[in-house]
Design a protein with these regions (language model features):
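Canonical alpha-helical transmembrane segments of integral membrane proteins
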Residues: 43-53, 119-128
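Aromatic- and histidine-enriched alpha-helix N-cap/loop-to-helix transition segments
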Residues: 42-46, 71, 150
Length: 196
């Protein structure tokens, strides 16, 4: 009877171990998909900036010309970031994740978007400062146009980063409590660990 109970426990724990692995793979695929889609959004914004502002730089209004020039520059940088981000998410291997790997990835992506949001606030502030001090500069139109563009780009990125952070944060809530239970198996071994 004891052997039967031990065998039943072994089968149950093994099933849980495989179910946990499948759940981790599913979670990682979803996180990767969110990352790729967010890079497509950033890439779309960047391309739109480059196209629209590329045409709009042909204006007689000097302030608006500088505004659009800066939009094109930001668009190029953001397009490169979006391309590299998409490529990085695409090549990421998620076929055999451990719980520690999943938690590390989730923590890293949430921190990244929080740090980015902080930088976005700095961009908006820098653009505002350029705008407000433009009259004291040798080329006030350039400072004002660049400042307005930096405020626009920083404002968009702040909203973008806040939304993407919220998406990843809500997705990460699926892991709440999971880190307390760890099941693993290997050749000749089986372990179930519950952390209080």
């Amino acid at each position: 009877m004891q052997k039967f109970i031990l065998l039943l426990c072994l089968i149950t724990v093994t099933q849980y171990s495989f179910a946990q692995k499948d759940a981790l793979i599913k979670f990682e695929k979803e996180r990767k998909n969110y990352s790729k889609k967010s890079m497509l959004v950033l890439g779309g914004w960047s391309a739109a900036n480059m196209i629209v502002s590329g045409f709009a730089t042909n204006t007689r209004n000097r302030e608006m010309r500088y505004f659009h020039q800066m939009n094109v520059m930001w668009g190029g940088i953001n397009l490169a970031i979006a391309g590299l981000g998409y490529w990085g998410a695409e090549k990421e291997k998620i076929d055999n994740p451990t719980l520690a790997d999943v938690l590390k990835h989730q923590n890293r992506i949430e921190k990244t978007y929080l740090i980015n949001a902080g930088l976005d606030v700095v961009y908006v502030g820098a653009g505002l400062l350029m705008n407000k001090t433009s009259e004291n500069q040798k080329n006030p139109d350039k400072f004002k146009g660049y400042g307005n563009s930096i405020m626009l780009q920083g404002g968009f990125l702040l909203i973008y980063d806040a939304i993407i952070y919220t998406i990843h944060r809500n997705h990460g809530k699926q892991l709440k409590g999971v880190e307390k239970v760890t099941v693993s198996s290997g050749p000749g071994s089986l372990s179930l660990i519950y952390t209080f």
